[in-house]
Curated annotation (Swiss-Prot):
It comes from the Bacteria. HAMAP family: RMF. This is Ribosome modulation factor. It comes from Xenorhabdus nematophila (strain ATCC 19061 / DSM 3370 / CCUG 14189 / LMG 1036 / NCIMB 9965 / AN6). The keyword Cytoplasm applies. Belongs to the ribosome modulation factor family.
Length: 52
């Protein structure tokens, strides 16, 4: 069970990173659960830093 949860969160992180690299706004986050949303936003923020 923990492995599946971790995989889901890792996927949210990588999708957020990809969205940030493409320059999409953070309001486009597709996740509604707090955990997945925070991972997506973390990836998005990291991508924004990497683009600079």
């Amino acid at each position: 069970m923990k492995r599946q949860k971790r995989d889901r969160l890792a996927r949210a992180l990588s999708r957020g990173y990809h969205a940030g690299i493409l320059g999409r706004p953070r309001e486009n986050c597709p996740y509604h659960s707090l955990d997945a949303r925070s991972y997506w936003l973390g990836g998005w923020r990291q991508a924004k830093e990497d683009r600079v």
